C-alpha cells in the first residue's frame, strides 16, 4: 500500500562503507504516474521534516572517514596545443590554447549522507568546493571540510570570503554568477531551465532537490517563465547549494542554470535583508571585540565612556532621591564653566517673571549673557527690594549647601559678597563693550591706512614695471654677448682639438717607422 506523501531522495539513502568508489551518487525514488494522479500532494508551507533534520542526520556520520567521490577531476575545458617548450613557473602550466566545453549535465553529484565524513581539516577550515560538486578525489586526506554548513558555521563567516575561501567582490557580475557580492546578503538562488510540462507540483520537486543543502526559508515557482527562486535561512547554505546544483538536473532531466537572484523589490523582503545585514554586522563587531587583547578591550571601553554630571547632592546616604524644587528652563552660565546649569536664583524669581510676561510688562525683560532671562537689573546694583530679598534667600541656601550660615553675617559682609558676586559675574560687561568699540575704531583706521598703502603700492608697481623693462633689455644684451663668446670659445676649442689629433697621428706614424726599422735590423742580424 503506497503512502499518499511522496518520499524524497534523502529518505531512501543508506550509508555505504568508505571503500566504495562510485562516481555518480544520484539516487531518487519517484512514484508512478498513477499514484500521482490519484493523490494530489498539497503545497508545503514551511520546512519539511527531512530538510529540518538533514543537519542532525549528518552529525551522526561525521565520525567516519570521508570517502573519495571520484577517481579523477573532469575539467570544464579541453586543453589544446599544450606540448610546447614554454612553461609558466608562476601557474605551473604549459602555454597553450584552451577551449571551453559546451554546457552539459554534470557527471557527478554530491550525496551528503554517503559522502560526508571527517577529513584532515580543522574546525576553522574552509569547505571543499569539489566535495560540493561531488568529485573530490582526496576523501579523508582532503584539507577542507566534507559536510554541509550549519548555522554555527554561518556565524563565523567573513563578509569578504565565501565558505570555500574564495574572495567576494563589491558588486555582482553582469550574469549574476560567481561568488557573489559582499555588499548584500546573498541567500536567494535563481533556478532557470525548469520543465513545466510535467505532472505533479513543481514547488515540491524544487524543494526536494534543494533542501538537501540546508534549511529553506521559501520556494517560489513562476510557471509561465519556467524559473524558480529558492531562499535559504543562511548565506552559507545558499553558497553551498549554488555549487552543488550547478549543471545538475531535477527529476525530469532538465539542465539547471543556477545564479544569484537580483535584489527583491518587495518592501517586506528589503526590511528583512536590512535586519539580517544589521545582525551580521553586529556579530562581526562582537567577534572582533572578543578576539582583542584585554588591554585593547580596556582602551576601547575607555573611549566609549562619557562624562556625566555629578548628581551626588540629588541623593541621600541611602541612595534615595532628595525632593528638590523643579528646574526651570532659565539658565545661567558661570564664568569659566563649560556647562549650563540651572541657577537657583533664577528658580526663585521665575514665577514673578512669568506673571510679568503674561501681563505684557516685558519692557525690561532681556536675556542675561545670552542665556536665561533677567529683568530690572543694572550692573553692580540691586535696584528693587524684591530682588534684594530674593538674593538674600538664594545666598542663604547657597552657603547652607556648603555648611555655612549666611544669616549670621553682618550687613557689611553681605555687601562685600554682593559686590564680589556682581563683579565676578557681570563686572566685565562694560569692559567688553569698550573693547569692542575700540576694536571697531582701530579696524576703521587700519582700513584707511591700508587704502593709502594700496595707492602707494600701485605707484611703486608702475615704477617697478619700468625698471623691469630696462632690466630685460640689459639682460638681452648680456645674453647676446655671452652667446657670441661661447661661439668663439667653441671655434678655438675645435681648432685645438684638430691640431692635437694631427700631432697624435704624426707621433703614431713615427713610432711605426721606427718599429719597422728595428724589425728589419733584427732580421739582418739573424741572417748574419
UniProtKB/Swiss-Prot annotation:
It comes from the Eukaryota. GO terms for molecular function: pre-mRNA binding; U6 snRNA binding; zinc ion binding. Its main location: nucleus. Pfam families: RRM_1, Torus. CDD domains: RRM_cwf2. It is found in: Nucleus. This is Pre-mRNA-splicing factor cwc2. It comes from Dictyostelium discoideum (Social amoeba).
Amino acid at each position: 500500500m503506497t503512502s499518499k506523501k511522496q518520499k524524497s531522495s534523502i529518505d531512501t539513502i543508506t550509508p555505504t562503507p568508505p571503500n566504495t568508489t562510485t562516481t555518480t551518487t544520484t539516487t531518487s525514488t519517484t512514484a508512478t504516474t498513477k499514484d500521482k494522479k490519484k493523490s494530489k500532494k498539497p503545497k508545503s508551507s514551511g520546512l519539511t521534516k527531512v530538510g529540518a533534520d538533514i543537519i542532525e542526520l549528518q552529525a551522526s556520520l561525521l565520525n567516519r572517514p570521508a570517502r573519495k567521490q571520484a577517481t579523477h577531476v573532469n575539467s570544464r575545458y579541453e586543453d589544446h596545443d599544450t606540448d610546447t617548450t614554454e612553461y609558466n613557473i608562476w601557474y605551473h602550466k604549459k602555454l597553450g590554447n584552451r577551449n571551453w566545453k559546451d554546457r552539459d549535465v554534470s557527471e557527478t553529484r554530491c550525496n551528503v549522507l554517503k559522502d560526508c565524513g571527517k577529513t584532515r581539516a580543522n574546525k576553522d577550515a574552509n569547505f571543499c568546493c569539489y566535495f560540493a560538486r561531488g568529485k573530490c578525489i582526496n576523501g579523508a586526506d582532503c584539507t577542507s571540510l566534507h559536510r554541509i554548513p550549519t548555522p554555527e558555521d554561518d556565524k563565523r563567516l567573513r563578509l569578504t570570503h565565501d565558505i570555500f575561501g574564495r574572495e567576494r567582490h563589491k558588486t555582482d557580475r553582469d550574469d549574476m554568477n560567481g561568488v557573489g557580492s559582499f555588499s548584500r546578503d546573498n541567500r536567494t538562488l535563481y533556478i532557470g531551465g525548469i520543465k513545466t510540462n510535467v505532472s505533479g507540483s513543481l514547488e515540491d520537486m524544487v524543494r526536494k532537490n534543494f533542501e538537501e543543502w540546508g534549511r529553506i526559508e521559501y520556494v517560489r515557482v513562476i510557471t509561465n517563465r519556467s524559473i524558480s527562486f529558492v531562499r535559504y535561512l543562511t548565506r552559507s547554505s545558499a553558497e553551498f547549494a549554488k555549487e552543488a546544483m550547478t549543471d545538475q538536473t531535477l527529476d525530469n532531466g532538465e539542465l539547471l542554470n543556477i545564479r544569484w537572484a537580483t535584489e527583491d523589490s518587495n518592501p517586506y523582503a528589503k526590511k528583512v535583508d536590512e535586519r539580517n545585514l544589521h545582525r551580521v554586522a553586529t556579530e562581526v563587531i562582537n567577534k572582533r571585540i572578543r578576539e582583542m587583547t584585554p588591554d585593547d578591550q580596556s582602551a576601547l571601553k575607555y573611549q566609549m565612556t562619557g562624562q556625566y554630571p555629578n548628581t551626588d547632592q540629588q541623593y541621600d546616604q541611602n541612595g534615595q532621591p532628595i525632593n528638590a524644587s523643579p528646574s526651570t528652563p532659565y539658565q545661567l552660565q558661570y564664568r569659566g564653566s563649560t556647562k549650563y546649569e540651572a541657577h537657583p536664583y533664577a528658580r526663585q524669581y521665575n514665577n514673578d517673571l512669568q506673571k510679568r510676561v503674561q501681563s505684557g510688562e516685558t519692557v525690561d525683560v532681556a536675556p542675561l549673557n545670552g542665556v536665561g532671562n533677567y529683568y530690572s537689573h543694572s550692573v553692580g546694583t540691586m535696584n528693587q527690594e524684591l530682588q534684594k530679598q530674593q538674593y538674600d534667600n538664594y545666598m542663604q541656601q547657597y552657603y547652607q549647601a556648603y555648611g555655612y550660615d549666611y544669616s549670621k553675617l553682618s550687613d557689611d559682609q553681605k555687601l562685600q559678597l554682593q559686590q564680589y558676586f556682581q563683579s565676578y559675574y557681570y563686572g566685565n560687561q562694560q569692559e567688553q563693550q569698550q573693547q569692542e568699540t575700540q576694536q571697531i575704531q582701530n579696524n576703521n583706521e587700519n582700513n584707511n591706512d591700508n587704502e593709502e598703502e594700496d595707492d602707494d603700492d600701485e605707484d611703486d608697481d608702475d615704477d617697478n614695471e619700468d625698471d623691469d623693462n630696462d632690466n630685460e633689455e640689459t639682460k638681452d644684451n648680456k645674453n647676446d654677448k655671452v652667446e657670441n663668446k661661447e661661439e668663439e670659445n667653441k671655434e678655438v676649442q675645435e681648432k685645438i682639438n684638430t691640431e692635437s689629433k694631427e700631432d697624435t697621428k704624426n707621433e703614431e706614424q713615427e713610432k711605426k717607422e721606427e718599429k719597422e726599422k728595428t724589425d728589419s735590423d733584427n732580421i739582418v742580424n739573424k741572417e748574419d
